[in-house]
């Protein structure tokens, strides 16, 4: 996990002693809401203005992290506990026309034209998959979701966030996209999620 801090009030920023660039996002939004190119923060003035604007707009604290410049992965997972398995790993690759450096709200909303999702299975992807599954199990997540990972400057995948209630739109949501690329039909994905929940309830 990258170094991080949480900002709710301007005074909180005074305590932040981290190396720039940093990355800012609301603590509890989905679909990239609040993430824009300005989320990559280069100095303290930007840190203050971006954080205070986010707190005001989204009415919640902001998480500040060391910016991770490497490859971004999202790992699909179905199942619970030791029965949790990866459905595949995709790399999120921003096209030239996309907003730079960040998997932003705009990039997600216009993913068909701005983002390439590539199913990957190289050593870095496998490392991301391993830690994503460990995070899923460690956090007690259930049935189906995603874990987002991004590599630091040394190529080490870092945990970014878990999505325990992911979007399941068959064409626009990341989890179904992963499954489709991995040869798992939408129907099978839904069946896996339901079967995991049924096993939990009737055991």
How would you label these PLM feature ranges?
Residues 27-29, 108-110, 165-168:
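Short connector loops/turns at beta-strand edges and beta->alpha or beta->beta junctions
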Residues 19-21, 72-74, 146, 159:
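Broad gene-expression machinery/nucleic-acid interaction feature
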Residues 43-130, 153-158:
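Phosphate-binding site of ATP-dependent enzymes
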Residues 31-34, 112-115, 170-173:
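Short small-residue beta-strand/loop micro-motif enriched in glycine and branched aliphatics
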Residues 122-203:
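ATP-dependent carboxylate activation and anion-phosphoryl transfer catalytic cores
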Residues 1-63, 69-70:
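Active-site nucleotide/adenylate-binding loops and adjacent lid/helix of ATP-dependent enzymes
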Residues 24, 64-65, 147, 160:
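Active-site flanking residues adjacent to catalytic metal/cofactor-binding acidic residues
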């Amino acid at each position: 996990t990258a170094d991080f801090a949480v900002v709710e009030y301007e005074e909180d920023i005074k305590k932040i002693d981290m190396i720039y660039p940093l990355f800012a996002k609301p603590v509890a939004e989905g679909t990239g809401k609040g993430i824009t190119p300005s989320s990559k923060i280069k100095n303290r003035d930007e840190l203050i203005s971006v954080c205070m604007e986010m707190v005001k707009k989204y009415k919640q604290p902001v998480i500040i992290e060391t910016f991770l410049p490497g490859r971004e992965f999202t790992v699909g997972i179905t199942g619970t506990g030791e029965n949790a398995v990866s459905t595949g790993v995709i790399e999120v690759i921003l096209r030239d026309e996309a907003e730079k450096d960040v998997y932003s709200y705009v990039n997600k909303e216009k993913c068909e034209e701005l983002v390439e999702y590539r199913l990957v299975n190289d050593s870095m992807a496998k490392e991301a998959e391993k830690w994503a599954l460990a995070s899923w199990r460690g956090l007690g997540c259930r049935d189906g979701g995603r874990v987002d990972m991004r590599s630091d400057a040394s190529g080490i995948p870092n945990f970014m966030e878990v999505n325990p209630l992911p979007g399941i739109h068959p064409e626009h949501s990341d989890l179904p996209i992963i499954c489709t690329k991995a040869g798992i039909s939408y129907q099978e994905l839904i069946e896996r999620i339901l079967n995991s929940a049924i096993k939990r309830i009737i055991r």
